[in-house]
Amino acid sequence: MLNNYKEHIRNRPYMSGVDRDKLRVKQTAEVFTPQWLVLEKIDKLDEEEPILFTDHTKTFIDNSCGDGEFLGEVIIRKIERSGCSLEQALSTTYGVDLMEDNVEECKKRIMGPNPTPELRVIVDRNIVCHDGLTYDYKFE
């Protein structure tokens, strides 16, 4: 299961799934973090605060989650280091993004290749389209 999930998360072209023309980039100032840098950041977090990944109850929130590159790697690391299930990892992983198409791509990405109805409910609750600066972070 984990290998299929990793493949689903990692084998995507950079910034895939969303049409990003020059005008959109100019209007939204969107910048997407490449996978190599995401992995570097996650490794640094794991080195400095390993409990973030060994305790599956620890919460992660990305206030500009984009297409889920960072959240997907957080989920992989939680599963690898804590032994939790995908459902448990998703239950404590949250994301906010201003752009609806990014939110939809993030949801598709982090649910994995074969999402169950239960995973869809969790992800629909935990990944929301909103302004990360003004959102109340209740995830209701």
Where are these regions (language model features)?
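SAM-dependent methyltransferase catalytic region
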Residues: 1-140
